[in-house]
Amino acid sequence: MRLLFLLFILLVCLAQTTSGRKRNSKFRPCEKMGGICKSQKTHGCSILPAECKSRYKHCCRL
């Protein structure tokens, strides 16, 4: 019974790790498009159509 419980816990942990990797992969396009995530108060940068992790930042062209 304990072995079954430990296997279940391991399965839950692995599922959370893979979902975390998928969540972070959608934020990579900013770097792939040649940009960097900066705060919204930054002036003088052209905004790229990519996502950043923080909702208070946008992707700026370097």
Swiss-Prot record:
Signal listed as a keyword: yes
UniProt keyword Secreted present: yes
One BP annotation, GO: defense response to bacterium
Subcellular location: Secreted
Gene Ontology CC, one term: extracellular region
Keyword terms: Antibiotic, Antimicrobial, Defensin, Disulfide bond, Secreted, Signal
Domain of life: Eukaryota
Functional summary from the UniProt entry: Has antibacterial activity.
Protein name, entry field: Beta-defensin 33
Organism: Mus musculus
